[in-house]
Structures are given as structure tokens and as C-alpha cells.
């Protein structure tokens, strides 16, 4: 049996990308953002089509993402942040709540969101991961923007076929 298969599309030309970056753990978050923006450019996304906003910390990322998603101006969004374990339970709270919020926004607004909020035990781990994770976020955003547009087109094609079937039935009646 032969099945249809979608091949990942990393062509960013014409895509509009919104980025929300935490300022907490700023050196790491700036490293994430630099790598992400460089990779978006490498993938063909124009600087004019990228909006980067900053928020105080990881817990504020979901609200900013929601506002960007509500605007319907972006094909994909990216969350950038760094939550580094400290001495208290706060690490788990921030990690879990920011991640859940990011996922909820993606599902509620049918908008792809690349989650590059690092959760690490140490500053050194975060620094070691920031460049590759920033690049990865750009690739995920572009790939998922293209995938969702393709899947949306499938839905539109199916609706068009249903409309044609309804018209045929009306003509026969």
C-alpha cells in the first residue's frame, strides 16, 4: 500500500514569526534569541516579518504569546526563556506553569508555538544549550507554520468538495 506523506518544509520566506523572550536569566535568553533570529534569517524569514517582544520572566511568556496569537498576524510563535533550578520549589512551579500555558495558547489559538524555555539545573547547562535550542526553536516554528498551512489547505479542499456535493444535490432536486 502506498500512503501520502508530508515532507518537512523549512522554507521561511513570507512567514511571519512572533518571538516572546524572557529577560530573567538575561545572558542565556539573549543567547537563545541571537541564535533563533540568525537561524530564522538562514531559513529565509525576513527581519521585517519577525517581531520580538520581551517580558520579565517565564511566567509572563504565555500572556504575551496569547496577545500575539489573538492578533492573527503570525504564522508561528516562539517562546524563549531560561528557568534554572534554585534552592526552592519555585523552579518546578515556573517550569510547569509556563510550559502548560504555552501549550494551552498553541491549542486554544491553533497557532504553532516553538517552546524554547530551557529548564536546567545549572547556569552552565543553560549556557551549553542556548545556541542549539535557539536554532531549534526557529526550525520548529518554520516547519510547523508550513505544516499547519498545508493541513489547513486540506481542510479547505474538503469543505470545497462538500459544498460541491451539496450544490449537485440541490440541482437534482
Swiss-Prot record:
Keywords in alphabetical order: Riboflavin biosynthesis, Transferase
An annotated Gene Ontology molecular function: 6,7-dimethyl-8-ribityllumazine synthase activity
UniProt xrefs under CDD domains: Lumazine_synthase-I
Keyword Transferase appears in the UniProt entry: yes
Gene Ontology cellular-component annotations: cytosol; riboflavin synthase complex
Catalyzed chemical reaction(s): (2S)-2-hydroxy-3-oxobutyl phosphate + 5-amino-6-(D-ribitylamino)uracil = 6,7-dimethyl-8-(1-D-ribityl)lumazine + phosphate + 2 H2O + H(+)
Highest taxon of the lineage: Bacteria
UniProt binding sites for 5-amino-6-(D-ribitylamino)uracil: 24, 58-60, 82-84, 115
Pathway stated in the Swiss-Prot or TrEMBL entry: Cofactor biosynthesis; riboflavin biosynthesis; riboflavin from 2-hydroxy-3-oxobutyl phosphate and 5-amino-6-(D-ribitylamino)uracil: step 1/2
InterPro entries: LS, LS/RS, LS/RS_sf
Record-annotated active site: 90
Biological role: Catalyzes the formation of 6,7-dimethyl-8-ribityllumazine by condensation of 5-amino-6-(D-ribitylamino)uracil with 3,4-dihydroxy-2-butanone 4-phosphate. This is the penultimate step in the biosynthesis of riboflavin.
Name of the protein described by the UniProt record: 6,7-dimethyl-8-ribityllumazine synthase
Species assigned in the record: Burkholderia mallei (strain ATCC 23344)
Lineage of origin: Bacteria, Pseudomonadati, Pseudomonadota, Betaproteobacteria, Burkholderiales
Amino acid at each position: 500500500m502506498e500512503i501520502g506523506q508530508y515532507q518537512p518544509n523549512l522554507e521561511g520566506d513570507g512567514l511571519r514569526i512572533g518571538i516572546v523572550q524572557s529577560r530573567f536569566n538575561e545572558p542565556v535568553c539573549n543567547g537563545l534569541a541571537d541564535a533563533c533570529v540568525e537561524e530564522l534569517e538562514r531559513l529565509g524569514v525576513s527581519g521585517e516579518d519577525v517581531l520580538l517582544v520581551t517580558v520579565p520572566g517565564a511566567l509572563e511568556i504565555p500572556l504575551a504569546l496569547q496577545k500575539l496569537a489573538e492578533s492573527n498576524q503570525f504564522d508561528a510563535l516562539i517562546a524563549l526563556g531560561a528557568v534554572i533550578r534554585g534552592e526552592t520549589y519555585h523552579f518546578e512551579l515556573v517550569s510547569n506553569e509556563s510550559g502548560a500555558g504555552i501549550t494551552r495558547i498553541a491549542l486554544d489559538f491553533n497557532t504553532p508555538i516553538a517552546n524554547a524555555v530551557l529548564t536546567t539545573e545549572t547556569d552552565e547547562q543553560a549556557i551549553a544549550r542556548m545556541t542549539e535550542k535557539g536554532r531549534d526553536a526557529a526550525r520548529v516554528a518554520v516547519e510547523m507554520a508550513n505544516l499547519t498551512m498545508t493541513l489547513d489547505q486540506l481542510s479547505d479542499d474538503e469543505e470545497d468538495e462538500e459544498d460541491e456535493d451539496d450544490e449537485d444535490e440541490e440541482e437534482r432536486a
